[in-house]
Amino acid sequence: MSDSNSTFKDLGVAKWLAEALNSMKITQPTTIQKACIPEILAGRDCIGGAKTGSGKTIAFAAPMLTKWSADPCGMFGIVLTPTRELAMQIAEQFTALGSVMNIRVALVVGGEDIVSQALELQRKPHFIIATPGRLAHHIMHSGEDTIGGLKRVRYLVLDEADILLTDTFSDALATCVQILPPKEKRQNLLFTATMTDQVLALKDAPPTSGKPPLFSFHVENLDDLAVPASLQTTYLLVPEHVKEAYLYQVLSSEEYKSKSAIVFVNRTISAEILRRMLMQLEIRVTSLHSQMPQRERTNSLQRFRANAARVLIATDVASRGLDIPAVQLVVNYDIPANPDTYIHRAGRTARAGRGGEALSFIAPKDVSRIQAIEERIGKKMDEFTKVGDTALIRKSLNKVTVAKRESLMAMDKEGFGERRKTQRSKGKQTKSLHS
């Protein structure tokens, strides 16, 4: 690996790109960048592992852009990622880095107009940043003039590869990959924050004939996924029927009323109920979940980044990768089934040595999950004592109950949830057509 004082130019990055990075105040390569950039430039397939915020995007973007600038023609590379927000963020970075070279970047994600995307693909963008489901839709339904360029791409990147290699994405991913050049004729780059069995299986696969050996690198202690030492991990035993009242009491308490927070839930309907309820209770709140139209999701993120909202209610779409400023409090309103998900959520606070707190609401059914999390992070959670006065909870319970009831009535009137049923129905019909 390159020495600790390496510059991007030392790593082999094109002069124009090193200057572009410098203008963005990115001057010192991170560990993952120093390890992977020279190897990718040398033509090796790569598996790179590092925690969120370690610079993984530039680790694959810099060598791809360097090679592209030497021969800037046609569709050059595809980056697949599991969420729309991550895709948008990566597309923004590619566009910013390549703007001096007139780069063309296409964003192909759900929630946006399909016809406009098809027209954009026909214009042969240099790089396509996509979610697998939407790109697979174009491959199955668009003409050769739209997707023909995919057959000649030189790079395939799977970002957040551990998620993309799960069953959730397997069908769409297979559709995307089958139209690309065979693996012998393209470079395959996988980046992840978690080394799962599926990722390790690819690492240990037999070498591809005619290609240099696979390069695999992960930043030390990645597999430990240890939570930062500056993070307080706390729990609060909360009866299920008064969880909303406890959440309101925490967020509006003297201790937390001016602090930024992300509240993680397991279901989209919970995110929507809590957003509406807290808004009625005059807390500056926004939300992020898969049932929101794309424009609303983008606006919601922008509001939270700009501190127009101090509380973000989110499903796990917000736990990884997204460029969200570090917050002071993470609340696990619902406990995740996977301990690693807890770690990714908690990673939204206590960054860069700063303090932070991850508070988990625990109902009796969650005890086994908490034990698994404590075993995974190697430490016991402390009991949360800052808020929890039962008299105060009882006092706020009535207005919280009213706010929740009014929120549910409004959602029912608007048909919230019907959209999801329609989407599921369409998905089943589409799947049956292609089965």
From Swiss-Prot:
UniProt-recorded name of the protein: ATP-dependent RNA helicase DBP8
Binding-site residues, ATP: 50-57
Record gene name: DBP8
Example GO BP: endonucleolytic cleavage to generate mature 5'-end of SSU-rRNA from (SSU-rRNA, 5.8S rRNA, LSU-rRNA)
Entries under Pfam families matching the protein: DEAD, Helicase_C
Function noted in UniProt: ATP-binding RNA helicase involved in 40S ribosomal subunit biogenesis and is required for the normal formation of 18S rRNAs through pre-rRNA processing at A0, A1 and A2 sites. Required for vegetative growth.
Motif (DEAD box): 159-162
InterPro entries (UniProt xref): DEAD/DEAH_box_helicase_dom (IPR011545), DEAD_box_RNA_helicase (IPR050079), Helicase_ATP-bd (IPR014001), Helicase_C-like (IPR001650), P-loop_NTPase (IPR027417), RNA_helicase_DEAD_Q_motif (IPR014014)
Taxonomic placement: Eukaryota, Fungi, Dikarya, Ascomycota, Saccharomycotina
Predominant location: nucleus
Biased composition (Basic and acidic residues): 411-420
Record's comment describing the protein's domains: The Q motif is unique to and characteristic of the DEAD box family of RNA helicases and controls ATP binding and hydrolysis.
GO molecular function, one term: ATP binding
Localisation per UniProt entry: Nucleus, Nucleolus
UniProt similarity note: Belongs to the DEAD box helicase family. DDX49/DBP8 subfamily.
Catalytic reaction annotation: ATP + H2O = ADP + phosphate + H(+)
GO cellular component: nucleolus; nucleus; small-subunit processome
Organism expressing this protein natively: Eremothecium gossypii (strain ATCC 10895 / CBS 109.51 / FGSC 9923 / NRRL Y-1056) (Yeast)
Domain Helicase C-terminal: 246-393
Ranges for domain Helicase ATP-binding: 37-213
UniProt keyword list: ATP-binding, Helicase, Hydrolase, Nucleotide-binding, Nucleus, Ribosome biogenesis, RNA-binding, rRNA processing
Enzyme class: hydrolase
